[in-house]
Amino acid sequence: YKCFPGGKFKVLTLSYDDGKLEDKRLVDIFNKNGIRATFNVNSGLTDMPIRLPASEWNDLYDNHEIALHTCTHPTMNRCGSYEIAREILEDKTNIEKIIHKPVRGMALPNGAGNKLITSIAADLGIKYIRPATDQYAVVKSALEYANDCEGPILLGDENGFSMPTDYMNWIPTCHHNHNLVEFGK
């Protein structure tokens, strides 16, 4: 059997994008309950009123992972090789300067990826990507469906929670919808 730190056989991974102000409340809930998550931030968008300033990342996300979400959040499969490399490398470099730790992971903006993006990201030191296939239509459809749905929206392996077979194409199992907090109460 595969075993995780502490002799655990199962793990829960949570991933949140964009470094928004709402993360403060979310991190507080996670910290009170001993839950850790990955927060995928955009170093080039921290001056927006809905985003957390980079100066708050170290304190807020302490005990959580910070991963990149590209510098300016473009739909990456619409970008050329140079822009893909620049978006990833600039975000990775900026974040590492702020948090003084290596950045290993990445979430693709709008879920849009392809083999070129995966290859460039790997060459730049990225160890995992969520998701790395073109899931944009799937995610958009799920979000539209969520308006009339109760509970989480399944995106990946709805019959189980297997370990990813390809960390550079880490498809999520489900996506939070607008009622998820209420369902958890």
What are these regions (language model features)?
Residues 1-14, 159, 169:
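N-terminal pre-catalytic segment of deacetylase/amide-hydrolase enzymes
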Residues 7, 19-20, 98, 166-185:
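Catalytic grooves of carbohydrate-active enzymes
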Residues 7, 11-15, 23-34:
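Active-site-proximal N-terminal segment of extracellular/periplasmic enzymes that hydrolyze or transfer
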Residues 16-19, 70:
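Active-site metal-binding loops of divalent metal-dependent hydrolases
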Residues 22-23, 74:
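Hydrophobic positions within alpha-helical membrane elements
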Residues 23, 84, 88, 180-184:
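Aromatic/hydrophobic pocket-lining residues that form the small-molecule binding cavity
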Residues 31-117, 124-127, 133-151, 155-171:
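Metal-dependent polysaccharide deacetylase catalytic core of the NodB/CE4 family, i.e.
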